[in-house]
Amino acid sequence: MGEIDMNEDVYVLGIETSCDETAAAVVKNGKEIVSNVVASQMESHRRFGGVVPEIASRHHVEQITLVIEEAMQRAGVSFSNLDAVAVTAGPGLVGALLVGVNAAKALAFAHGLPLVGVHHIAGHIYANQLVAEMKFPLLALVVSGGHTELIYMEEHGKFTVIGETRDDAAGEAYDKVARALGLPYPGGPHIDRLAHEGEPVIDLPRAWLEEGSYDFSFSGLKSAVLNTLHNAKQRGEEIDPKHMAASFQESVVDVLVTKTVQAAKQYRVRQVLLAGGVAANRGLRSALQDKMKELPGVELVIPPLSLCTDNAAMIAAAGTVLYWQGKRSDLALNANPGLPLV
C-alpha cells in the first residue's frame, strides 16, 4: 500500500511517553495537527546530567491525564469524534512507555476505539508527513539520543534499515562531549550554539568505516575529544570550548550528511527526510541543505524544531497510516523497550 488516499476524515489521538516528554495530540488525516501538547521534564533531570528512569515514570503518571485532557480540549473534539488511539509502544524506557500504553489501552477500551501501537522511530519519520507529502521511494536520516539510522522506504510502513550506528548514537556522543566541556544537560543544543561561535581548527577523526557501508560510529570521535581535552589539561593548556564544539560538530555532521547523500544517490530516491531530536541541530540542517544541492531532483524535507523532539503528533501521524492499513493492536499490547523497527 504505497500512496494512501482516503476520502473520509480520520481523527487520531496520539500519546507519547517513551522518555522524558509526556505528550498527547490530535491529528486529522495523518497530516494536519489539530492539537499538540508536550509537557517536558527537562528541568527535573538536568541536575542529574541525564534522564533518570524512575523520575521520568513518576512525572508521566502525574501528567498523562492532564496532557490528554488538554489535547482533546484544544482540538475541540470529544472521544466520540475520534477514530483511533495511537501510542508509542517502544523503544524507550520501559516504565515510561508503560504509562502511555496503559493510558491508551484504558481510553480505547472505555470508548470502544481501535488501539494502534506505534514504533517511536516510525513516529519520528512520520513527523515529516505533517509538513510535506511523502514521496516514495524515500530515505530518512534519523538522528536522536538513542538512534542514528538511515532508513529506506519503498512505501508507507515498509522500512529497510540500510545504515545504523555500531556504537554510540550521535545524540549520545553530543551529551558525553558536552559533559566533558562542562556544558549542562541536554548537551546537543549547547554544543550547536557554541559551534557557531568557534572554528573547526582541531583535527578530529571521521569514521567512514569500510567502502560502501552506510553504518556510523561515533565512539572513536568521542574518545578523541576526551583524550585531546585530557592531554591539554595534563600539559596545563587551555582548549577553547567553542573551537572544540565546532570541530566535534563538523566531524559528526560531515559523516552524517555525506553518507545520507551517497545513499540517496545509490537508492535513487525522490525524497530525503531528516528526523529525530538531533534534527533540530542548526549545523546539521544547514549542512544537509548544502550537500543536497548535489541532487537537484530530490526533495529535502526538514520538520520544524517542535516536531523534531519527542511529540505525540508524529505518533498520531504514523498511527493513522497503520489505521488506514487495517493494522490494530489488541488490549494485550505491552511496552517493549527494545521494539525492532523491522
Swiss-Prot record:
Highest taxon listed in the record's lineage: Bacteria
Chain sites annotated for binding substrate: 142-146, 175, 188, 192, 281
Cofactor, free-text remark: Binds 1 Fe(2+) ion per subunit.
Keyword terms of this UniProt record: Acyltransferase, Cytoplasm, Iron, Metal-binding, Transferase, tRNA processing
GO biological process, one term: tRNA threonylcarbamoyladenosine modification
Function (record text): Required for the formation of a threonylcarbamoyl group on adenosine at position 37 (t(6)A37) in tRNAs that read codons beginning with adenine. Is involved in the transfer of the threonylcarbamoyl moiety of threonylcarbamoyl-AMP (TC-AMP) to the N6 group of A37, together with TsaE and TsaB. TsaD likely plays a direct catalytic role in this reaction.
SUPFAM superfamilies, per the entry: Actin-like ATPase domain
Annotated PANTHER family: TRNA N6-ADENOSINE THREONYLCARBAMOYLTRANSFERASE (PTHR11735), TRNA N6-ADENOSINE THREONYLCARBAMOYLTRANSFERASE, MITOCHONDRIAL (PTHR11735:SF6)
Chief location category: cytoplasm
Keyword Ligase: no
Protein name as catalogued: tRNA N6-adenosine threonylcarbamoyltransferase
CC per GO annotation: cytoplasm
UniProt GO MF annotations: iron ion binding; N(6)-L-threonylcarbamoyladenine synthase activity
Pfam (any one): TsaD
Family: Belongs to the KAE1 / TsaD family.
EC number: 2.3.1.234
Catalytic activity: L-threonylcarbamoyladenylate + adenosine(37) in tRNA = N(6)-L-threonylcarbamoyladenosine(37) in tRNA + AMP + H(+)
Cofactor: Fe(2+)
Subcellular location: Cytoplasm
Species the sequence originates in: Geobacillus thermodenitrificans (strain NG80-2)
Binding site for Fe cation: 120, 124, 310
